């Protein structure tokens, strides 16, 4: 257990001694603390959201058998047996019939459902839960309202009726629109726990037939977007959704590899002709019958091409035919590597996951503090507990993140945002202070003392309440750094 979790558990233990009612509250909050972080996947209609969710889970679950279920927020969580419940707006939970791993039908009208809770015994979601949403600017206004109600407005509702997300994966296919960026900010996240995904990377730019590899082009564009959106997202990762879904859901078979390999000798012009003409125009091949796939007729060739494009897209058709000669395993490995999902998953469970967990911890602190304003609980004792938590070095990053969120809302252009972000994101003394990795402990102490003086001078200026509070936490963080560096 990490130091933050230990500190929060100790605080909850103490909270539970105040009264039987607060003991129950502490146990409920502790359950939230122990659960894996929840990551919401958001994006516009046809942004590739469903294919990404399927790839991350490793099963085609985002596109359910019940069409109306795609218009409801769905939480995918690790657990057995495979089951689902509809959580209604009134807090009631109704079981949902699962057939062949898919939601067969909803037990209530969509407008009465808050969200669907789905448990799956799938190791791929053991480290984090996923929240799939109807999306932004969908075909109906109601769909976007459902997403907002559950993820934003729902925080003020009872816990049985709301979904608390700890981080967001934000999909877009070129450049995000202002309303999309605003929605992410409305979720209450910072750039540290918001991850951008440039979807459909395998068709970026000029596409599969362009002079430039679309995946390379997409990666360069993703780097540009990451710099432009640095105040909103941690980074931007290019993902080829169809390659991701196909390779991670076990769809590719040996037969698929064989029929794809039958096109290995065809030129790109052959394949274009087959797709465009229905195959008849290249019957007999273009220079020796290479496109025939061992004598297959034009119609059969077109069916093969369509099957391949349906599995791994045009990029896969044009780039992986020779790979297919080595069998389904090699083809699947190629698609996995090209998809971008391994890089995405690694980030989700490491650095990004750490920030999601810190966000969760901040939400727990705020929830403990909110208990003080209930008439049935001892206000002074709870507020004293929160005050003690603020001075706990193990929780300094949690309070820095809470301050970052508050400052972002009141003054997004203040220098404090850069200082707060650096202190939160840095793993070493040097990183937290913006120093080179080779900086000595003397350099660390000297720089921290200079920044401590700067923070003190800033606190003498006329600032917003959020900035005043942030400077107090920043000064505490610099003092902690000085103390720990001197002890090295």
Residue ranges with predicted function:
Residues 1-18:
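Charged, amphipathic alpha-helical linker segments immediately N-terminal to NTP-binding catalytic cores
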Residues 17-20, 460:
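Charged, low-complexity interaction regions
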Residues 22-31:
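Pre-Walker A adenine-sensing motif
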Residues 26, 368, 474-478:
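Short amphipathic alpha-helical coiled-coil/interface segments
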Residues 30, 34-269, 287-293:
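Globular "head" domains of long coiled-coil molecular machines
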Residues 61, 206-209, 356-357, 456-463:
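Short, flexible helix-adjacent loops and helix caps
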Residues 204-207, 213, 219-397:
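C-terminal end of P-loop GTPase domains and the immediately downstream helical coupling element
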Residues 395-488:
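N-terminal J-domain/J-like co-chaperone modules of DnaJ/Hsp40 proteins
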């Amino acid at each position: 257990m990490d130091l933050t979790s230990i500190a929060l558990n100790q605080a909850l233990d103490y909270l539970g001694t105040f009264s039987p009612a607060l003991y129950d509250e502490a146990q409920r909050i502790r359950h939230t603390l122990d659960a894996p972080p929840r990551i919401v996947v958001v994006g516009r209609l046809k942004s590739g959201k469903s294919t990404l969710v399927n790839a991350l889970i490793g099963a085609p679950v985002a596109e359910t058998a019940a069409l109306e279920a795609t218009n409801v927020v769905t939480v995918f969580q690790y657990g057995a047996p495979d089951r689902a419940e509809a959580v209604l707006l009134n807090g009631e939970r109704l079981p949902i019939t699962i057939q062949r791993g898919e939601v067969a039908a909803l037990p209530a009208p969509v407008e009465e459902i808050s969200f669907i809770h789905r448990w799956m015994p799938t190791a791929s979601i053991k480290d984090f839960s996923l929240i799939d949403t109807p999306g932004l600017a969908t075909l109906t206004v109601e769909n976007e309202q459902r997403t907002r109600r559950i993820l934003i407005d729902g925080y003020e509702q009872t816990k049985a009726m709301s979904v608390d997300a700890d981080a967001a994966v934000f999909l877009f296919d070129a450049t995000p629109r202002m309303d999309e960026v605003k929605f992410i900010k409305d979720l209450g996240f910072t750039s540290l726990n918001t991850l951008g995904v440039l979807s459909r990377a395998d068709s970026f730019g000029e596409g599969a037939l362009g002079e430039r590899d679309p995946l390379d082009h997409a990666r360069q564009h993703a780097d540009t977007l990451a710099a432009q959106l640095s105040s909103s997202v941690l980074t931007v990762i290019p993902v080829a959704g169809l390659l991701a879904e196909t390779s991670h859901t076990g769809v590719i078979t040996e037969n698929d590899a064989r029929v794809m390999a039958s096109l290995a000798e065809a030129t790109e012009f052959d394949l274009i002709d087959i797709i465009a003409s229905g195959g008849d125009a290249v019957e007999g091949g273009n220079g020796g019958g290479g496109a025939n796939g061992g004598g297959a007729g034009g119609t059969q060739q077109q069916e093969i091409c369509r099957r391949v494009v349906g599995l791994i897209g045009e990029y896969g058709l044009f780039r992986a035919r020779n790979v297919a000669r080595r069998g389904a395993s090699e083809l699947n490995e190629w698609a996995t590597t090209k998809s971008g999902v391994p890089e995405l998953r690694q980030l989700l469970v490491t650095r990004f996951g750490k920030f999601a967990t810190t966000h969760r911890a901040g939400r727990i602190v705020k929830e403990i503090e909110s208990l003080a304003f209930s008439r049935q609980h001892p206000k002074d004792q709870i507020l004293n507990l929160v005050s003690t938590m603020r001075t706990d070095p193990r929780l300094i990053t949690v309070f820095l993140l809470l301050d970052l969120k508050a400052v972002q809302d009141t003054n997004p252009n203040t220098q404090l945002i850069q200082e707060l972000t650096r202190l939160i994101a840095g793993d070493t003394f040097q990183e937290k202070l913006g120093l080179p990795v080779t900086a000595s402990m003397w350099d660390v102490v000297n720089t921290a003392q200079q920044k401590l003086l700067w923070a003190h001078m800033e606190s003498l200026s006329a600032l917003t309440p959020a900035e005043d509070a942030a400077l107090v936490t920043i000064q505490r963080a610099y003092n902690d750094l000085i103390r720990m560096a001197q002890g090295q």
